[in-house]
Amino acid sequence: MNIVLEPGASALLDALHRAGFAAYAVGGCVRDSLLGLAPHDWDLCTAARPEQVMELFGEKQCIPTGLQHGTVTVKRNGRLYEITTFRTEGSYSDGRHPDSVAFVPDVREDLARRDFTINAMAYSAEEGLCDPFGGQEDLARGVVRAVGEPLRRFEEDALRILRLYRFAARFGFVIDEATEAAAKQLAAHLDCVSVERIEEELNKLLSAPKPGAYLEPEVLAFVLPELPPDDLSEAREIIDALPAGAEEVTTRWAALLLPLGEDGTRKALKRLKCSNAVIDGVSTLVKEKAPRTPALSLQAKRLLGKYDLHTVQQLTALWSALRPERKDEFTALQKEAETLTAQSACCRVSQLAVNGRDLMAAGVAPGPGLRRALEALLEEVITGRLPNEKAELLAFAAKFSAS
């Protein structure tokens, strides 16, 4: 085991220890450290009460984030650290938040309330690793397992059902059999979770390296009821073939929602309260069909006439996953679009060497005919029949307006 505490977290823990309080790094930062990953955040837990934490570090350095739950955020060297008092939790009448919390002196009681064993470990330089539920062994085995009784963990907070699949997908772990059985049994409880939290978890799940196997139909039925109840094996394969990462999640959403079509996709994403940018981005990928013809440059220009380069890149990635036998063709199409963009090639009316004022000066009447003339000029340019040069375009426009 090799856990190196981040300097700011280490200093805060030292201060708490010197003041006579037990204190540990806890949760995801311990898990990630044991996996050899760099933690994004360092959360700390302590026997000190919130008011004692604020007194120790000074009110100017403290934000009373959630005093009723024992959490104080401490500012140090430009970073924020959440310090939470050891606690147990009462019943969860809403299936999401505890009705009450009770502060306790023992970190083991605090760890017992957490979701999965890999997240229920604490560490301090003085005492080493505190792992009462076998989280380190589960990390070594590659298993996600609930702390204690799985049904109780999911009854407390139904969002943990999605977190189960998200953590398993993130690390490529298997799910403990009893834990998954409980998750499926209580999947209907996801109805009481806000759609914003569901969308956030689904985004994280779809951002994982290979999330296909973790898209469980018995769970998705309650968070994406719009999806047909058929086998998801094809969608899983397509999603796994697409690039991974948060910036690529739009393309994976499109692969998942493809059976719904554009209108169905929009409705599903609106219900999840996704941003307009996400709704438009995913719907665009769903509606656009792969070109049938191999006219590479022309197809690339037509796509760039409708979409920006990033959307074209997403489309070609999606089509490659949908039609792997045409992957080379779609890769070439993407490269052609990238080349055309780098060359500032004319693919839109706005990129023509003439504009509406030029055409009116050349005798084209304003109104619908003006727009048709510009579109005709663009077609001549992108098909290569005319160069994008002002004199050539005006000469053609004069013929067009006379016809």
Sequence positions of predicted segments:
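Catalytic cores of the polymerase beta-like nucleotidyltransferase superfamily
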Residues: 1-403
